[in-house]
Amino acid sequence: AEKVAVTIDDNVNYVDLDDYLLGVVAGEMPANFELEALKAQVVASRTFVYNRNLSVDNTVNSQVYLSEDEMKKNWGDKYNEYHQKISEAIKETDNEVMKYQGEYISALFFSSSNGYTENVEDYFESSPLPYLRSVDSHWDLTIDPKNTRQTTFTKQELKEKFNCQDLNFNIIA
């Protein structure tokens, strides 16, 4: 089996690829998500690690990897159920990766956006990539209660939106 070099606290640990994917999916998303979501995360995570030549660290700069002990601690009595579910996602996507023009893509992912994604070069020091372009993701606003959105209005725009030309901005707290 292929091994992934995972740097944790300046120590390099060599982990079987499937075991690594199990730990990454456990660390990157809730195991109670639907199987198809877990499978998508497996494919993204597998692609990510191949893009990095099977050498990563255990931080958000790479992918968060949980050990067996950490999974047992986090999942408690759900450990066997969640372990089996993620293992199934790994098995069902065996060898599936994402490529662009024959190369592994930079499979960057996040839990949710604020209604749209970012161009890769606007967020990372990177050249533009045709597959990492900003797109609308308005559904994120409804599925993630932690999302907030800030919008700026002129005083006149607010008066028009509230249909109140007498609105006194000096008393708005």
Please state what every model-predicted region is:
Residues 1-173:
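Conserved, single-site charged/polar hotspot
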